Amino acid sequence: MQAPTKVATRTAIAASGAPVTILAFAGDIASTSKEPILEAYGATDAQKLLLDFSGTEYVNSSGIAIIIQLLLDATRNGGRTVGIFGLTPHFQKVFTMVGIGKYATLSPDEATALRLL
């Protein structure tokens, strides 16, 4: 049974001194995650955005499609810089294989992600 997706929003400061909005996901990322993820994303106008997957154990193909939709909107339409951190080793490989690294920097942890933004 899938754990419902929750998204918490917080602010941090990048190494450059710029404000960063962090969307921290908890639960599984699947088709039912679209509304909470895109709603949280739509509520921020930050130019630097981090997606925190440290509270996520499972992401299915529908979940990956939602993340790609968010990334395409953020980078192409919004001109935003996006980073991702907290992926399990398995999903680090999956995200790399499907090309998410073209749209977001993949980092092992928050400190590294903030340094790279």
Where in this protein do the model-derived segments appear?
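STAS-typified acidic loop motif
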Residues: 2-39, 53-55
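Amphipathic alpha-helical interaction surfaces in cytosolic regulatory modules
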Residues: 31-104
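Short acidic-hydrophobic, aromatic-tinged amphipathic segments that line or gate anion-handling sites
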Residues: 105-109
